[in-house]
């Protein structure tokens, strides 16, 4: 008796997105760690120096987290009201932050009480930063002003009053200690020079500006507001290079990768987009559970931290290369193992027997082998199989139809079982690779269960969904045929124009057949 031949499962190519280097790079993060804060996380900032701790501004507190810690290692809570925009100095030893009451406070990382307090703003301070010389702080507030402060003397040096609405974002140049950028809800981004009493450059963003970012070289400026991210060339007097519109809601934060080759933007649409700084195309995207307010990357992009409106802080760490574990050394076989059978002399009457390889059958193959056709169909109609590997279900249905027992396998089912079959048909009937097999199965089901339609509301609903799917597919096919007919007419018209013949008379009176080339 011949052995049982397993069912051949037809495989199909997986059609998906092209795997790029960016996809591999940005997907190489572990499962995110989520930390609950006391309020919306308005700012996240990494220390530029080891061990690369990061400051989280939420509600009336500033938490300092270690790079791999889930609990704050230090907390600054000397704020009467909401704190904003905690930012590290370049050496990582000082931290500056604004507050709702208009104050600006300077902290030493090793202490708790503020070292300096700058009073001068009359409304909430939403942006602060250190200048490149480390001895000055620039701040912007809801009183429409931008101020420059001297750290050693705790005094105000300059005040700029050129904005006509809230100043909500800003940054200082990393190269020039006299230059700093501010963005406002008056739709403008301005560059100020501490050596003058007015702005030296102004660009119109077109929307309330939520975030600005200056490239380390100082040649490019990025502004975010509304659904737009715009890149400006500062060396050409603020000329607009590109305007990006890849978010569906307001863009709230910007960040640059460690190499400077990738720009990241976070938005209220719960997505973080990664752009190439050469082509300015989206090369990757992250999805989050809530609207995003803040975003920061650690040194060498080892950690990405995102703050959200629901107070959740999402922390992703890059996967480390797996170390090869040293396995215990296997004992070497004894010498007699190697010489076993070496001295055996083959005889003419010896019979050589090959050990047959044992074949392991799948459960549905075992059922088919023993003619349990209904049970085999039940196994492949399990939701786990139909969702993950629908090609197995289709192959079993095809095999049952080839044997002529598909109707027997489908008959005699209760409401729950027939619902599983109809759900699979509804989900996969419109797929071209499965359609020939499933259309035949659908016809058999309709023939079997037509007399009992109307007895079960659940089954009736499934049949109506199947009917609607078939009608929609017929409409699609009709539209495609109409489109093909129109294309055939166009192609036929073009061919006639290319080969049009006209009769022209020659000098001897006989007609000449001449073609006009289009």
Curated annotation (Swiss-Prot):
Chain positions of cross-link Glycyl lysine isopeptide (Lys-Gly) (interchain with G-Cter in SUMO2): 249
Localization of this protein: Nucleus, Nucleolus
Stored PROSITE patterns: WD_REPEATS_1 (PS00678), WD_REPEATS_2 (PS50082), WD_REPEATS_REGION (PS50294)
Nucleus as UniProt keyword: yes
Gene3D superfamilies the UniProt entry points to: YVTN repeat-like/Quinoprotein amine dehydrogenase (2.130.10.10)
PTM sites of type N-acetylalanine: 2
Record InterPro entries: U3_snoRNA-assocProt_15_C, WD40/YVTN_repeat-like_dom_sf, WD40_repeat_CS, WD40_repeat_dom_sf, WD40_rpt
Gene Ontology terms, MF aspect: RNA binding
Signal peptide range: none
Superkingdom of origin organism: Eukaryota
The entry's keywords: Acetylation, Isopeptide bond, Nucleus, Repeat, Ribosome biogenesis, rRNA processing, Transcription, Transcription regulation, Ubl conjugation, WD repeat
Annotated SUPFAM superfamilies: WD40 repeat-like (SSF50978)
SMART domains the record matches: WD40
CDD domains linked to this entry: WD40
GO biological process terms on file: positive regulation of rRNA processing; positive regulation of transcription by RNA polymerase I; ribosomal small subunit biogenesis; rRNA processing
WD repeats: 36-75, 78-117, 120-159, 162-202, 204-242, 246-285, 287-326
Cellular component, GO annotation: cytoplasm; endoplasmic reticulum; fibrillar center; nucleolus; nucleoplasm; small-subunit processome
Purpose of the protein: Ribosome biogenesis factor. Involved in nucleolar processing of pre-18S ribosomal RNA. Required for optimal pre-ribosomal RNA transcription by RNA polymerase I. Part of the small subunit (SSU) processome, first precursor of the small eukaryotic ribosomal subunit. During the assembly of the SSU processome in the nucleolus, many ribosome biogenesis factors, an RNA chaperone and ribosomal proteins associate with the nascent pre-rRNA and work in concert to generate RNA folding, modifications, rearrangements and cleavage as well as targeted degradation of pre-ribosomal RNA by the RNA exosome.
Self-association state and partner proteins as the record states: Part of the small subunit (SSU) processome, composed of more than 70 proteins and the RNA chaperone small nucleolar RNA (snoRNA) U3. May be a component of the proposed t-UTP subcomplex of the ribosomal small subunit (SSU) processome containing at least UTP4, WDR43, HEATR1, UTP15, WDR75. Interacts directly with UTP4 and WDR43.
Protein name: U3 small nucleolar RNA-associated protein 15 homolog
The organism of origin for this protein: Homo sapiens
Lineage: Eukaryota, Metazoa, Chordata, Craniata, Vertebrata
Gene name linked to the record: UTP15
